[in-house]
Amino acid sequence: ETVSHVALRRIGDSLSLYCALGGISFSIDERNCLIIHAPHFSVKEFVTNDVVELVDSRNFRWIGRYDHVINTGGIKVFPELIEKKIAGLFTRRFFVTSCDDLKWGESVALVIEGEALSLEQEKIFLEKIRAKVNKYEFPRKVLYVQKFKETSSGKVIRNI
């Protein structure tokens, strides 16, 4: 992580805004990625790969990571937003990523930790997902991984 403790957000409310701490302020670059202005740090400006909706110079809503974006037929889809929409359907860990697609370049893939569902269970599960996401966000492929790899800090490594 580039910088820690520059903003706070209410716990448990993924739609609430992040609010700047102290003398911190924010702007965005041409990718809509967050730029942190921190006059009290030795490096005064940090450019991140976090795509945000900037409300004003002190408040933003986090959308996702620029380096995770899926470009499916020219439509940019953020895995983190899909994950928020479908999180309530899961009892096990999962993540959304991209997979190669001959027609669209990339498409959405759902990776689930643990044993594979039966074809019938998977079909029912995908219908529940379809009700929560738009057509560009719908997983075209479901993959199963016995155990997710993690970083030393416990974050899931999101590649397959």
Feature names for model-found ranges:
Residues 51, 158-160:
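A short, well-structured catalytic beta-strand-centered motif of the EAL phosphodiesterase domain
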